[in-house]
Amino acid sequence: MKMRPRYSVIASAVSLGFVLSKSVMALGQPDTGSLNRELEQRQIQSEAKPSGELFNQTANSPYTAQYKQGLKFPLTQVQILDRNNQEVVTDELAHILKNYVGKEVSLSDLSNLANEISEFYRHNNYLVAKAILPPQEIEQGTVKILLLKGNVGEIRLQNHSALSNKFVSRLSNTTVNTSEFILKDELEKFALTINDVPGVNAGLQLSAGKKVGEANLLIKINDAKRFSSYVSVDNQGNKYTGRYRLAAGTKVSNLNGWGDELKLDLMSSNQANLKNARIDYSSLIDGYSTRFGVTANYLDYKLGGNFKSLQSQGHSHTLGAYLLHPTIRTPNFRLSTKVSFNHQNLTDKQQAVYVKQKRKINSLTAGIDGSWNLIKDGTTYFSLSTLFGNLANQTSEKKHNAVENFQPKSHFTVYNYRLSHEQILPKSFAFNIGINGQFADKTLESSQKMLLGGLSGVRGHQAGAASVDEGHLIQTEFKHYLPVFSQSVLVSSLFYDYGLGKYYKNSQFLEQGVKNSVKLQSVGAGLSLSDAGSYAINVSVAKPLDNNINNADKHQFWLSMIKTF
């Protein structure tokens, strides 16, 4: 039997199988795999920007102003002393000293020299380094300069949060306590990673230590908002399970004192044709801020509309675990590494024709994602991931009705990428551009396909309009930000989206003349009114610029409202 893109009783009966899901996707019939993919669009996390510079490294000498150009003398040698008055090797300062040694200098020149030495060490990771010109008698043109690199003194903790003191100590032992000196990159990493911990606010304070050249570190931690919840409503659902969706969720932080987080999300479409529940629990497990988490997801659906007579319904449950590590944390660059494992059980039924489909999918995903302040007032975001999957497929369909390439078991590999840039412009304007896509080594089951439509794709089409094995999306958006009311922001935008892809990686089983590629594009405008931590209202309208989807809507109107507590 060859695959046909038209609807038939037999096609509908076997469409829930892996290979027969090819005809299904061309027709737009949802199943557990495609519905899970649509929900994943809703679960996309907001992108985290780098914080920007944390510490001011300028080291202005207090002596520069009081030393005026006066008596000069020939400088023959500069001795650099540490805080124990021991001479240190100065090879790394040769490029600075050569501008002074062998020349006639004044006290003002020596002050400038000390300042240059301070700046050199501060720009080479010694955050509080200071070169001092101590009182001295200059003999035979030899000048002594005291170099204080900034030794770690006392580290004190003022913890008024639910975060464990033991965890903070372990985190400091892998950063600020790894050197005898206060190093800028380690202190920055400590500040950034501890502020990544949910449910806390942290601050650092440096002060002079008891000994010469020492600096004490005070760590202040207070509870932030540990409990939060939300309710939301939108019209982003599938037309066969219900356009309107109601969702609610809650999040609790620091239950065990190790930066753990528990999240619960519930969702139902109108008439309850689609129900979904998701739980995610994660906790930090070491002093390097590595996070281990477990997830569980349940979905139940029943189709209406054109597929109601088939009595199509199904359910799925997914169990997963993941490791997330902040590989690089600097003020202008973030890089995280994630490894996850998921086990999915998907069941679809068409009771009118007595067809039942079961699939079990085990997948291992490894990936990186990050952000970079590469350009002034701009942030670049990126991600790369590879998924290795194993599919076990069972169907009640008779062998003579199955398609030619039906395989009870198969392996597959999927590659995903994303690159985007957000640029702040003058007069409260901004411009966003992004590209993302997917490659696969073979034809995929519906839960692994890429959706070209929806709010994360070509916004002039519904999420299930085109589901492809390989595809690419380009999105551009021009925004304007306007403060309104007391704390709200109104964002207006114009956007253009373009997507293209291949329905099936392997097309040799398609009938001749059946089109395997698709291109979508749309333009639109949107408005968003929000108050961070309180509410958000988003409205957008998009119009397709193509006629490549049969019976496609003439436009899409997207609405979502969320209230947070």
Swiss-Prot record:
Residues 73-150 form the POTRA domain. PANTHER family: HEME_HEMOPEXIN TRANSPORTER PROTEIN HUXB, SLR1661 PROTEIN. Likely functions in the release of soluble HxuA from the cell. Probable member of a two partner secretion pathway (TPS) in which it mediates the secretion of HuxA. It comes from Haemophilus influenzae. It is found in: Cell outer membrane. Residues 1-26 form the signal peptide. Belongs to the TPS (TC 1.B.20) family. One of its GO terms (biological process) is monoatomic ion transport. This is Heme/hemopexin transporter protein HuxB. Probably a beta-barrel protein. The lineage of its organism: Bacteria, Pseudomonadati, Pseudomonadota, Gammaproteobacteria, Pasteurellales.
